[in-house]
Amino acid sequence: MDNIKKVKALSIWIFIVPFVATNTCLILITQFHELFPNKENIIHFTFPYIDGGASISRTARYFPTYLVFKPAMFLTAYLLIKYWIFNKQIILNIHGNHKHLKKMLFFGIGSAICLVIHSIFLGIKFDIDAYKLFRRVIMLAFIIFEICLLYTSPSPRDFV
């Protein structure tokens, strides 16, 4: 029962931390232009939730916004790892050894690691094609891991 409370609390924090970080970056880059040393990095008059004028990556890749975004993503990745470990313990307590439990843990922690790697390299510019490919592969791996989690996570019918 204690693990269920931990998972509930972690779920809320896994939502709040990135939400606050991305919106803080958006506010900084659209409203506080004097903080940015390179004026071509600022964004004018956009509300990306409506007009799609900026991506999360675009708002978080420049100084000083990456000072907010990167630590928040590291914290989120840590919380995600704890989340999947506690979920594993909950499933072991309820169901015993589920057939996809190890895969679920692998893909959950793998996606958190991909998030960390992506956050580390966000905002770093190299004009090397291998570097650009590496960044895309990391994002693709993150997405694939999340999709695999959908198929490996137990559903309520597995516990009947």
Can you annotate each of these PLM segments?
Residues 3-19:
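Alpha-helical transmembrane segments and their helix-start/interface "positive-inside/aromatic belt" motifs
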Residues 22-87, 111, 115-132, 136-139:
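Early transmembrane hairpin module of multi-pass membrane proteins
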Residues 89-101:
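Membrane-interface helix-boundary motifs at transmembrane edges
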Residues 104-111:
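Membrane-embedded alpha-helical bundles of multi-pass transporters/translocases
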Residues 139-150:
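Generic alpha-helical transmembrane segments
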Residues 151-160:
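Single conserved hydrophobic/aromatic residue that forms the stacking wall/gate
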